């Protein structure tokens, strides 16, 4: 796994690309990013849920969730970049879900929420740039309620050896241009979440061959079985 960009560098990168992020990410991923968001929301969110979209960026996933939770639900959009959340605020108003959405900035590795706070926690493509994605994933699990669901989408390595070699070479070039790579790299956090006690309900690879995503949904057991990673 490549060394992550610093949080300060990430803030600068995402501040720089905020206005074109949706277009750029969809173009690079051939719109597989949207497919992943839809699948995760479909398999995680129910009417009336209280949802955290962590690393929400411009709010695309959170808005999908806000539409599904209905008037009785709530969605918190949480992101490191105020510039990205500024775009999210505009989109939330355009989609007329502002009454059920709140916004907060902060670091995903140190979430300012108590244990078991949300019925559903979502993270779409936001763990990949973190300096400690395993700890970030553990934080997502911590704030998910017992019996709740955690839905994650992140970059993963191609399963074909030749394709992986080609992807690594392309990534070598992209990594020299943070505005292009967006600090994203392949990670692997599902084993750590299973180790905490999470039950896998869905696990699926999607996306283009060079830049595949792993999307998964886990359920946090109602009776705590977790081994509290790093705590």
Task: Briefly describe each language-model feature range.
Residues 1-20:
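N-terminal, positively charged/glycine-rich alpha-helical extensions of SAM-dependent methyltransferases
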Residues 8, 24, 153-207:
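C-terminal alpha-helical "lid/dimerization" subdomain adjacent to the S-adenosyl-L-methionine
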Residues 30-47:
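Conserved alpha-helix/loop element of class I SAM-dependent methyltransferases that forms part
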Residues 52-110:
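Class I SAM-dependent methyltransferase SAM/SAH-binding core
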Residues 109-120:
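A short acidic, Gly/Pro-enriched loop at the edge of an enzyme's catalytic core
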Residues 120-132:
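A short SAM/SAH-binding and catalytic strip from SAM-dependent methyltransferases
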Residues 134-146:
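A short glycine-rich, Lys/Arg-flanked "PGG" loop and its adjoining helix->strand segment in the class I
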Residues 195-231:
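Core SAM-dependent methyltransferase catalytic element
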């Amino acid at each position: 796994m490549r060394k992550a960009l610093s949080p300060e560098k990430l803030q600068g990168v995402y501040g720089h690309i905020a206005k074109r992020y949706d277009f750029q990410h969809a173009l690079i991923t051939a719109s597989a990013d949207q497919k992943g968001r839809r699948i995760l929301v479909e398999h995680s969110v129910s009417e009336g849920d209280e949802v955290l979209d962590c690393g929400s960026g411009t709010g695309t996933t959170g808005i999908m969730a806000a539409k599904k939770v209905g008037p009785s639900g709530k969605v918190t959009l949480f992101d490191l970049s105020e510039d990205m959340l500024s775009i999210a605020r505009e989109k939330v108003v355009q989609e007329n879900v502002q009454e059920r959405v709140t916004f907060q900035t902060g670091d995903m590795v140190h979430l300012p929420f108590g244990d078991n706070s949300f019925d559903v926690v979502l993270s779409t493509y936001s763990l990949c740039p973190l300096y400690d994605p395993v700890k970030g994933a553990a934080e997502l699990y911590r704030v998910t309620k017992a019996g709740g669901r955690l839905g994650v989408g992140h970059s993963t390595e191609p399963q074909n050896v030749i394709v992986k070699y080609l992807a690594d070479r392309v990534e070598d070039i992209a990594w020299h241009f943070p505005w292009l790579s967006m600090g994203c790299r392949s990670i692997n956090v599902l084993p750590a979440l299973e180790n905490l006690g999470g039950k896998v309900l869905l696990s699926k690879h999607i996306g283009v061959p060079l830049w595949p995503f792993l999307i998964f949904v886990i359920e946090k057991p109602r009776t705590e079985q977790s081994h509290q990673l790093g705590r």
